[in-house]
Amino acid sequence: MKTEWFKLGIYTAAYVMSFVLGEAGLSAPSGLCLIFAAAFLYLSEYRRTASLMNLRGLLALGLLGGEGIARFQLSRLSTDWTLETWLSFYLFYLIFDLSAQLADHTGAIRSARSGDDADRSASCSVVPDPLASTASIDVRDVGGVPGRSATGESAGVDLRFFRYAILGLLGISWAAFLFEARRLGFVPLFTVDTPHAYSYFHVKGVHYFTTLAVLTPAVSMLYLAARRTHGLRPDVLALLGLLLPIILTILMVSRFQFMISVILAVFVALLSGRRYKLWQLLLLLALMIAAYVFITIERAHSVEYLNGIFEMKDPSTPIFITQPYMYIANNYDNFNVMTRELTVHAHGLRMLYPFVTLSGIKFLIPSLAQGFPLFVTKEELTTVTMLYDAWYDFGLIGIAVFALVLGLVSGRVTRTCRKDQNPFSVLLYAQLAFYYLVSFFTTWFSNPATWFYLGISFLLYLAYACTVRKRRKE
């Protein structure tokens, strides 16, 4: 416990120093303080859990690291942060971390009282170091789950379930894509001089199913891990499950869909106990960058167009620096604009938007789906951080409650995943890990697509559990 308080003390000191330096007009040192805090918190969590995929560490790395990058203020669009902005960003991680500790501590007490030692055996929180020099999978105690031993009886049902899941996801996503392409009359990749082709490639209610492709590579990694556990080599279906969804994201020229597909697959592999050599990770990173650049070129955004929007203080800054910088930093500046200009809060309507949309209530009560003005530095730059809607709804109280709930959920999910024998718990955990790592990018938990992916993953979780239970009864 003393270590935890020391860690948060360092975090607070770094934040105070960043605030003081920022108020003095020293942008770069202010940013470095927050980047130090992000790295320190992540490494502290890694030492505590021996896991590169620890949720508290990933959120620190993504959210606080993004704040540090934003504090460099390399664009003329950047402005001095308001006191509300500073307090929101500081309090969010503080409350999140404390509530996650509380959930983990109470869970440990409950396990000790019940004599439940199962949570010491599993793989979500404590996994082998993926940067180790050899690739291997841990063998534990339950069949069919990556990282656990398998019995011959369970092997067949496990592998069949994965095959059905992969075929189902591939069939649904490609059928939906072809339907959209036929209905809309174009495929974004093959358009000419259409910078926002993907933005128009949406058939209401159908596009959710097209983007289910992002889950397929991750499920394929679970399938590959299960095959290795059973002593089997990769098969054609596993390769198709990895490649066809990537091809689909390229056809849609969607950088986001491409990134989430690849990163989720890697996260699932790491959480399943897969170890990679450093050169393998570097090769994967190089391929991702190449594909990302290709998709960016196909989106038909010229360098002149992007530089004109970004308004960098140094016009000679190369585009490969300005584009990723602005896609991170400007999101925090958009939050700052909101704290200055918002006069009436939405009282929960923005955070509840996924429920209103996915339940169909918006068709019964259209007023609930009404649009709210977006407070941004520039109309072309509309991405925001994960905290944007919490403030939009209730201000600083919304930030505090959001942090509390997310921390409690994270602590509970981490403990549950440690002892859960269902491989699809890894898929759910990997999605949370991804959202935390890129928490600077959008309002994940008030985005209907986020809940759609989590919902489908949970259905796979339940279906797998029912299949195993039925098999045991036979």
Residue ranges with predicted function:
Residues 3-8, 26-41, 158-160, 229-235, 238-240, 259, 281-282, 400-401, ...:
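Hydrophobic alpha-helical transmembrane segments
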Residues 379-474:
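Hydrophobic alpha-helical segments
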Residues 193-203, 291-407:
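Small-residue-enriched transmembrane helix-hairpin modules in multi-pass membrane proteins
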Residues 5, 9-17, 170, 216, ...:
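Hydrophobic, lipid-facing residues on alpha-helical transmembrane segments of integral membrane proteins
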Residues 21-31, 102-276, 288-305:
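Membrane-embedded catalytic interface detector for glycan/lipid assembly enzymes
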Residues 1-136, 238, 242, 261-293, ...:
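N-terminal "leader" segments that precede or initiate the main folded domain
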Residues 36-46, 215-229, 401-416, 471:
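Hydrophobic, aromatic-rich transmembrane alpha-helices
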